[in-house]
């Protein structure tokens, strides 16, 4: 089996505009305020879009983006190369909120992460069996993993009653409602969704 680069984990720190390839370079006194994580191609793209929304609106919030390529019954990674508990703390910190979008059932990921540090702080959203959908964005929204769902949950996790953050959460709900209305009326996603320019990391 081919070894996954960096254990199949991609890390980007927004406040440094930097990819992290050496986990030993992560400093405990330079931690993010929150973490956006994803496993699965479509939900990762949506998480990247959520990061872009947040960077535009609340650039002062330090956000770590994490993509997890491989999961197994033992944890993050493969059976041969599973992420250790100490490396998990380096990457996911001890106590920062984690918003995790998953391409499978949320309870599956919850059981995989159970033995890692402080799993109660990890908000997981994944596949839910909810009726028929009209467009890709509609499907993401029904599963609560759209960019606006992720951005709203991220702000709620650090808002501490901040009025600006709370008004932005309402704005994200409105943007989502507008995008869904367009999708259901036209059977295609709105241009701002369809033509989104995703952040490039390479």
Where are the language model's segments positioned?
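Thiamine diphosphate
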Residues: 1-202
């Amino acid at each position: 089996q081919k070894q996954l680069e960096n254990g199949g984990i991609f890390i980007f720190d927004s406040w440094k505009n930097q990819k992290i390839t050496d986990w030993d370079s992560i400093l405990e006194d330079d931690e993010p305020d929150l973490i956006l994580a994803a496993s699965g191609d479509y939900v990762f793209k949506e998480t990247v879009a959520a990061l872009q929304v947040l960077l535009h609106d609340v650039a002062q919030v330090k956000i770590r983006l994490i993509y997890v390529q491989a999961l197994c019954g033992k944890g993050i990674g493969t059976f041969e190369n599973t992420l250790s508990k100490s490396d998990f703390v380096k990457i996911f910190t001890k106590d920062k909120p984690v918003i995790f979008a998953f391409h499978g059932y949320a309870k599956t990921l919850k059981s995989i992460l159970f033995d890692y540090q402080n799993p109660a702080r990890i908000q997981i959203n994944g596949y839910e069996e909810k009726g028929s959908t009209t467009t890709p964005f509609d499907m993401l929204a029904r599963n609560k993993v759209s960019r606006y769902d992720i951005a709203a949950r991220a702000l709620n996790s650090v808002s501490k009653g901040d009025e600006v953050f709370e008004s932005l959460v309402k704005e994200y709900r409105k943007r989502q409602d507008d995008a869904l209305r367009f999708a259901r009326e036209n059977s295609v996603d709105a241009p701002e969704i369809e033509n989104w320019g995703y952040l490039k990391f390479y």
